[in-house]
Amino acid sequence: MASASGAMAKHEQILVLDPPSDLKFKGPFTDVVTTNLKLQNPSDRKVCFKVKTTAPRRYCVRPNSGIIDPGSIVTVSVMLQPFDYDPNEKSKHKFMVQTIFAPPNISDMEAVWKEAKPDELMDSKLRCVFEMPNENDKLNDMEPSKAVPLNASKQDGPLPKPHSVSLNDTETRKLMEECKRLQGEMMKLSEENRHLRDEGLRLRKVAHSDKPGSTSAVSFRDNVTSPLPSLLVVIAAIFIGFFLGKFIL
């Protein structure tokens, strides 16, 4: 009995499958989703294969059968048809890769499978896994597209600098000249203000000694005349502050 059961035992799968056990399909599933299955033949013999599924209406497989030469690889495209995805429903779909060593002078593939003995067949089973992209995956997919304008802005930013430097040099010279002129005006106005203040004191002394009644008139005239240079000094200071602020910025 042991020998009989050993005779009926299947051979281990000769092909190397990639992926070996799970076919992963990544959503969204509003369109056809394709995943690839690589079949590698590491032996020195030709191997016949065919791909079966428990849900033939839901998938399109190309190629679904064929012959793999020794040391060769065949890529099988498994295309999942669009459907309404329910995250709470686990996929029960499965695939099976069935293989058999090709007989010499093979001419009819269908006849090979029909005449194959059970102990000559080798098979591997794979389950289907449906995955929806999470928020992190969406952000990672968006990052490359965002990086382009960010890098572009960084590259575009420094481009005008050589031109702006030459303008700043010319503008700096003008500002320095304007500052010097305004400083000279301020010194001149300060000198005039000091002179007028001294003159006002002298006039008040003269008026006080000669005509006491005219003190208020002189004082009034001094109060009217004196703020004018002070106002000019304030205006000049504002201009200097404006130009210096522009220069610093």
From Swiss-Prot:
Residues 135-166 are annotated as: Disordered. The modification Phosphoserine is found at residues 166, 214, 216, 219. The record marks 50 as: Involved in binding the phosphorylated serine of the phospho-FFAT motif. The chain crosses the membrane at residues 229-249. The modification Phosphothreonine is found at residue 170. Residues 135-144 have a biased composition (Basic and acidic residues). Signal peptide: none annotated. Endoplasmic reticulum (ER)-anchored protein that mediates the formation of contact sites between the ER and endosomes via interaction with FFAT motif-containing proteins such as STARD3 or WDR44. STARD3-VAPA interaction enables cholesterol transfer from the ER to endosomes. Via interaction with WDR44 participates in neosynthesized protein export. In addition, recruited to the plasma membrane through OSBPL3 binding. The OSBPL3-VAPA complex stimulates RRAS signaling which in turn attenuates integrin beta-1 (ITGB1) activation at the cell surface. With OSBPL3, may regulate ER morphology. This is Vesicle-associated membrane protein-associated protein A. The lineage of its organism: Eukaryota, Metazoa, Chordata, Craniata, Vertebrata.
